[in-house]
Amino acid sequence: RVWGRMPADRLEFIMPAVSSASPKLTFAFVMDPVENEPMDGSTTIVMMREAQDRGHTVLYVDPDDLEVDAGRVRSLAVSITLDLASETPITKGEARIYDFDEEIDVALQRKDPPVDRDFIVATQIMDVCRKTIVLNRPAAVIAYNEKLLATQFADLMPATRVTRRIDELKAFMA
């Protein structure tokens, strides 16, 4: 199923229900430019919308703006509001510097590969957070290749071969 079409009650494992008495949280999405996300079918947009619909604050953080200052993760971030029915589905607020451990409750790493130096440095910066809940865990993001991780569950997937050798791939596909 495409997550963008999944009923909200099926998303409880990602975004727990919040009652009116529950504290409102600040979610920071560390990701490639939010304007480039497809508005239909993007799991990142679905999670942003769910957080917003539940009354939480949603921030967009460009990984290039992350920094560590005196042992604290900080970043320029901008609040966003989503209205997917509008001609302008993303409205940005004022950009300002946020101290992650003091102002951000949950940070979601949604940066797409390639796993290059910039990706690794941004991930390592996120690992400095001590109070902020960081999803996906930075050490795991670096340690496990997202494509190769699935091979640890071979009994749950079709026959798969990972190789750089073209002759092996051709033989496998035959």
Label for each model-derived stretch:
Residues 16-53, 58-105, 111-174:
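Active-site nucleotide/adenylate-binding loops and adjacent lid/helix of ATP-dependent enzymes
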